C-alpha cells in the first residue's frame, strides 16, 4: 500500500519592519526566515522552531496566512 501524504501546515510571513538599528540577533533571525528586505513574503513550514523565530521578531514581521 502507498503511504498517505500528510499535508504539512504552512505559515506565510511578510517583513514589515526594518532591521536597521536592531540587535544583530534580530537581523540574523530575519535572514533565517528568508526575510532580509522590506515587504518580502515567504511561505514556511509551520514548526515550533519557525514559530519561535517569528515570535522573536514579531515587531518586524506580519503573519499573512496560516494553512
Swiss-Prot record:
GO terms for molecular function: structural constituent of ribosome. One of its GO terms (cellular component) is cytosolic large ribosomal subunit. The keyword Acetylation does not apply. Keywords: Ribonucleoprotein, Ribosomal protein. One of its GO terms (biological process) is translation. NCBIfam families: rpmD_bact (TIGR01308). Belongs to the universal ribosomal protein uL30 family. Part of the 50S ribosomal subunit. This is Large ribosomal subunit protein uL30. It comes from Rhizobium meliloti (strain 1021) (Ensifer meliloti). The gene is rpmD.
